[in-house]
Amino acid sequence: MDFLLWLEQTGLSAWVRESSSLWAYPTILFLHTIGLATVVGVNAGIDLRILGFAPEVPVAPMTRLFPVMWVAFGINALSGTALLIADATTKLTSPVFYVKMIFIALALVDLRLLKTHVFGDPFIDKGPLSPNAKILAVTSLIFWVGAITAGRLMAYIGPVSGVR
């Protein structure tokens, strides 16, 4: 707990938590929201296409969206870290935080498997997608819904945050 208290008292943490600057908490939260919307939105679009929605859209060109998702995830990781250190004693002592992290980790593993096994197939648009591709798409959607739900529940379950 001493480390969490120290982390919460660093200059960056105090600035994120206490600054009246628009560049502090509001901008970081905005970036976190945009990053999340991009990662999950693009990933969900790919998942839905794999599940058979919009069959006229070829799957193979969607591989170009993976770098967009990774950049958005990087923004999310950085902004999430800033939000986390601003309220470390609350968030890092909440079991819901760890549930969220597990769902994110599972979603990222799923995304990697999708990229390797589905988009790695040179005949991806030549026939129906495999049942395994569809399973990866469904589990991806489940993992992202779980991560988002856990993230929202952090505001309502567990220790009460001192942050806005």
Model region roles, listed by residue range:
Residues 1-164:
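Polytopic transmembrane helical bundles with strong interfacial aromatic enrichment
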